[in-house]
Amino acid sequence: MVSLTKRCIAEFIGTFFLVFFGAGAAAITLMIASGGTAPNPFNIGIGLLGGLGDWVAIGLAFGFAIAASIYALGNISGCHINPAVTIGLWSVKKFPGRDVVPYIIAQLLGAAFASFIFLQCAGITAATIGGLGATAPFPGIGYWQAMLAETVGTFLLMITIMGIAVDERAPKGFAGIIIGLTVAGIITTIGNITGSSLNPARTFGPYLNDMVFAGTNLWNYFPIYVIGPVVGAVLAALTYQYLTSE
């Protein structure tokens, strides 16, 4: 049995991986689209397919980060890298209650540190223009619409996790790529509604660093990205448990 300390370190690293590459890709896309980076030949493809093309690219960045994290760290901590997933697994007794808070703390710290390091790499415009990839409802999207989108998106993610990673009958070795592609698809679908967080930690890291370094306060939206994902994950876990019970 891997110690709790080692598992929490793995969760920290995995969530760092997710936010640095995923939210970082979102920030860079915004920076390039708004002229926040110097023109160069490598920028030419950005926006070539319009907004949808950018969401596909961002979704794939998240998807590859998740897949890599699962394959690298899954055997250590289970690679939740998401407080909603941790709570969802706990709700169906697939994760011990005593480890829930340490896991969530590790995930939040990993996300915050990832945003901080990305800011140091990309410069202050990553926060002032790119928002460090922070999520927020898009214009015309109401608070409850956004929460519903996050709930549905996380439900789909969690039902996939239950089927491909938690269920012992699932084929081995496919969890990383299937979960990663699922996240990429969900981001492409609801990205232009909520920014598609599906993960309280993924939103927490950019919010904290945006507030500290850019003076941007988005915390009024934070409940969307906590309540929506947690409700979606718990409902999915309970639904899967019901569907597979004898």
From Swiss-Prot:
<comment type="subunit">
    <text>Homotetramer.</text>
</comment>
<feature type="transmembrane region" description="Helical">
    <location>
        <begin position="12"/>
        <end position="32"/>
    </location>
</feature>
<feature type="topological domain" description="Extracellular">
    <location>
        <begin position="167"/>
        <end position="172"/>
    </location>
</feature>
<feature type="transmembrane region" description="Helical">
    <location>
        <begin position="173"/>
        <end position="193"/>
    </location>
</feature>
<keyword id="KW-0812">Transmembrane</keyword>
<feature type="short sequence motif" description="NPA 1">
    <location>
        <begin position="82"/>
        <end position="84"/>
    </location>
</feature>
<keyword id="KW-1003">Cell membrane</keyword>
<feature type="topological domain" description="Cytoplasmic">
    <location>
        <begin position="194"/>
        <end position="217"/>
    </location>
</feature>
<dbReference type="InterPro" id="IPR022357">
    <property type="entry name" value="MIP_CS"/>
</dbReference>
<dbReference type="GO" id="GO:0015250">
    <property type="term" value="F:water channel activity"/>
</dbReference>
<feature type="transmembrane region" description="Helical">
    <location>
        <begin position="70"/>
        <end position="90"/>
    </location>
</feature>
<keyword id="KW-1133">Transmembrane helix</keyword>
<feature type="transmembrane region" description="Helical">
    <location>
        <begin position="146"/>
        <end position="166"/>
    </location>
</feature>
<keyword id="KW-0813">Transport</keyword>
<dbReference type="InterPro" id="IPR034294">
    <property type="entry name" value="Aquaporin_transptr"/>
</dbReference>
<dbReference type="GO" id="GO:0005886">
    <property type="term" value="C:plasma membrane"/>
</dbReference>
<feature type="transmembrane region" description="Helical">
    <location>
        <begin position="104"/>
        <end position="124"/>
    </location>
</feature>
<feature type="topological domain" description="Extracellular">
    <location>
        <begin position="33"/>
        <end position="45"/>
    </location>
</feature>
<feature type="transmembrane region" description="Helical">
    <location>
        <begin position="46"/>
        <end position="66"/>
    </location>
</feature>
<feature type="topological domain" description="Extracellular">
    <location>
        <begin position="239"/>
        <end position="246"/>
    </location>
</feature>
<comment type="similarity">
    <text>Belongs to the MIP/aquaporin (TC 1.A.8) family.</text>
</comment>
<protein>
    <recommendedName>
        <fullName>Aquaporin AqpM</fullName>
    </recommendedName>
</protein>
<feature type="topological domain" description="Extracellular">
    <location>
        <begin position="91"/>
        <end position="103"/>
    </location>
</feature>
<feature type="short sequence motif" description="NPA 2">
    <location>
        <begin position="199"/>
        <end position="201"/>
    </location>
</feature>
<dbReference type="Pfam" id="PF00230">
    <property type="entry name" value="MIP"/>
</dbReference>
<feature type="topological domain" description="Cytoplasmic">
    <location>
        <begin position="125"/>
        <end position="145"/>
    </location>
</feature>
<feature type="topological domain" description="Cytoplasmic">
    <location>
        <begin position="67"/>
        <end position="69"/>
    </location>
</feature>
<dbReference type="InterPro" id="IPR000425">
    <property type="entry name" value="MIP"/>
</dbReference>
<dbReference type="InterPro" id="IPR023271">
    <property type="entry name" value="Aquaporin-like"/>
</dbReference>
<feature type="transmembrane region" description="Helical">
    <location>
        <begin position="218"/>
        <end position="238"/>
    </location>
</feature>
<feature type="topological domain" description="Cytoplasmic">
    <location>
        <begin position="1"/>
        <end position="11"/>
    </location>
</feature>
<keyword id="KW-0472">Membrane</keyword>
<keyword id="KW-0677">Repeat</keyword>
<comment type="function">
    <text>Channel that permits osmotically driven movement of water in both directions. It mediates rapid entry or exit of water in response to abrupt changes in osmolarity. Also exhibits a transient but reproducible increase in the initial glycerol flux.</text>
</comment>
